[in-house]
Amino acid sequence: MVNLFLPDFYFNSRMNQAFIELKENNPEYFNENCNIKAVYGVFPTSIWNGEVYCAAGCANDNAKETTAWYNDRGVSLIHEFTNCKLQPFHVYDNACNIYCKISEDENNYCCIVDDLLLDYISSTYPKFKFISSSAKQLWDINGLEVELAKEDFAYVIANPVFNPDKELFNISNKDKLILVANSSHKYSCPNDSQRCRYMSQLQLDYGLTPQDSDKFSCAHCTSVNEDFYTVMRDRKHFISVEDMYGKYSEEGINNFYIYGRGYNAFDVLEAYVYYMIKPEFQDRVRLMMMINLE
């Protein structure tokens, strides 16, 4: 079974829910062994959020309805709590704690980068399971193996630089490993750490200072504006649909993040069609979804 983790459970909810319902009603459209395991993202505005800037707000009832919709259909919710600039007092943020109370469930997860939130959430909301974020930027296989061996984590998202590395097939705990299939970031991007810190601080400053979430991205990470097929062509860490359902799955690596938080909706749609839908149904499903998104 290939488990897919879809982006932006809140801002991309219409598309995510449309694909989940389509899979329920027309499973013949989908690749064999395709499973929508979880949706990831944050409710706005969560200051624990990192990597992808998130503005606006979310009513508590909306958060409850969104969580229930996914969970009632067996789809897990993953909070992307990956802000690397948090201080101890930030754990008491009212909005983030409300969202945790609403969604605390043994089938839901928190994706984190350090022990601050791991310790706080595990003691305050013990039903959550945890995912180690790729934002930790582990650069060697040994470090990845150490992370996979930690009992604190149900899953570990690998740095995309490992995707082409055949050593992945020899590591232990492959059932806990998640690979990012279509990251647009350039291989070993020297600005990635700086970008994460910038976006984390920007999230903390929401409502306090003038916001310009594109400032760093446009100056240093032009790859964020590249479309799905450019990423497919130019990134050696891109995972093709053939390899995902073929060699990776055959070697016991079955969990894949589809990138798309903050991306153009039609670019995300193209990724969904590519990874989930059988070739003979792709045009039909693409049109159905474009009409649905109008």
Which stretches of residues belong to each language-model region?
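Active-site pocket-lining/capping segments in soluble small-molecule metabolic enzymes
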Residues: 1-147, 153-294
